Amino acid sequence: MHSALLRQQLAAFLSPAELPDDDAPFLLDQRKRYTSTDCVVVQPASVENVQKTVRFCAQHRIAITPQGGNTGLVGGSVAHGGIVLNLGKLNRIRHISLADNAITVDAGCILQNVQTAAAEHGRFFPLSLASEGSCQIGGNIACNAGGLNVLRYGTMRDLVLGLEVALPNGELVSHLHPLHKNTTGYELKHLFIGSEGTLGIITGATLKLFAPQQTTETAWVGLDNVQAAISLLSNIKNHFAERLCSFELVSRFALQLSAAHSRLAEPLNAEWHILLELTDSLPRHDLQDELAEFLCQNGGEHSIIAQSDQQRRDLWTLRENISAAQRSLGTSIKHDIAVPIARTAEFIEQCGRDLTEQHPDIQLVVFGHLGDGSLHYNTFFPNELGDSVYRREEAVNATVYRHVLHNHGTIAAEHGIGTLKKSWLPQVRTADEIALMRAIKSQLDPNHLFNPNKLLPD
């Protein structure tokens, strides 16, 4: 159906405000690599209008691409024909139950707004991402977002108590009760968490809340090598247990980029750096002394412990600005990978050696969540941009992913598969697993209208 005619028919049941005149903000993906074409953008302002839109599309066999904050990095919400259904107008905080430590929200709620709502009620919602000021809860769930606090609180899958989902036939499956235990058969919410919008459109969610942190200690540690970081992680997890919230790895080059971009001094001079954070829900005046003593006794004597909120913010700025610093240099080839923590040093050493032998001008920007085994293993070429870089992508990816698989890892730790990585899925999932995924997809979406050409290989 032609876009103009499609828009005209949608206007029969959607208001003008739900059919934005300016499509541009919804068409270009975050990395400016993929652009939606020949499609109509809709922003339903109610769950009922999401259902009406889905039923209309089912009747006319029109593809639907769900979209949250459009912050994804793998082309997961880019459409070629049909409808882009953006959830941004579904942005209410529906209910907070302090007794249940739960918050129920619309899928279009900005993550930061959920964090704020929880804080206003004396609670803490732990999901934390660089894009938290613009990403939406529905997208976080659809991609099973991870972020900075996985080490203590788990991924988004661990934070979801219940979901409300519009199925491809327009029916609504809703189980938003804040139950922490439920053994009545298959836990259907897990079908939709991490499904990247291919099975249903998440319209609402009930999420876990936690006690706020009363004590926070943040340290920056300089180390000679990654194996030393792994040893420190093992010891600190054993000593501080659940109080260890974050354990971030940063290479020397990644720090140099971020420090220059952020106009901040490098905290320490070392080949590898760790940013770690301890939190406690009780006031603890001795936690800093305990951390300092521990670091001195466990190879972390070359370290700084933040002495003020401003110093803590500066340390986190250095970590969080790495991606922005790299973007300012031009086109990157990015890898969102994970390997078992014990094999991280081997992966970094062997993969880096092979890449520099194959591409002498390559620059490696290595950082990420060592505490849970996931890394942002990024590359760029100082004198190349755009298509020139992408022509090298196949060879670079082949090397990186070969080492990931050799070390029993995954090619998608946090960002999902989307368009970018779907051809690689058979390398990390068995034929039987992919066949089962296809069977689930066909059962729920027999006409394959929801987020077509994503996730599953052609």
Model feature map: region roles:
Residues 1-31, 59-62, 295-312, 406-411, ...:
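N-terminal accessory segments
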Residues 1-55, 72-101, 254-263, 309-333, ...:
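N-terminal flexible segment immediately upstream of the FAD-binding catalytic core
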Residues 20-24, 207, 217-222, 228-392, ...:
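C-terminal substrate-recognition/cap domain of FAD-linked oxidoreductases
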Residues 64-66, 71-73:
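Active-site cofactor/substrate anionic-group-binding motifs, chiefly glycine-
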Residues 92-248, 450:
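FAD-binding subdomain of flavoenzyme oxidoreductases
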Residues 171, 422-458:
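Activity-critical C-terminal alpha-helical subdomain
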Residues 253, 370-373, 411-423:
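Small/polar glycine-rich anion-binding or flexible loop at a beta-alpha turn
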